């Protein structure tokens, strides 16, 4: 979920970055595999990068809605349903890096007690965490509150472990176009093999829909935004 950029992330283009790095590697006579990642949604996208000199590609978003993915199935439905305006890039991570996530993530704004004693993955070299500082600030401001709300940071260690922060890729809103909906309104989960094969064999930017487990209510691509 961390973007690796500042809040000016939208000014950068993956194809341009890959071209610049490839040119630099060639100028320095460095034989280092170049593997782009981020927004590569179809096999055609992947082929374009390989033809531009990439050694391979890294993909993730489409696999979040596969049966093999470790996310709970109900949360996978949140990924399917998400539209562009349901997703934000924020700075609530204690690392300070921007993260992209679904706005309805229950961990956003939650004031859970810090769990650094149990996890503490993000503590700095002095044992500090930006969430602890934010939590203590809210605790001092609202000493009698039964439940705190911390808006500017999140207890990332705990919420990621408990599937309460739903980080996602920039093409998440397109996931609904990769599946079909059952009569109950739920999107059909895909198999990792189906997604992998689609990356291998899709052409002209097309996405292969799965064979429906039951008669679909409507093709997913007909959903209103």
Task: Describe each region flagged by the PLM.
Residues 1-33, 41, 48-225:
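Conserved active-site-proximal phosphate/metal-binding subdomains
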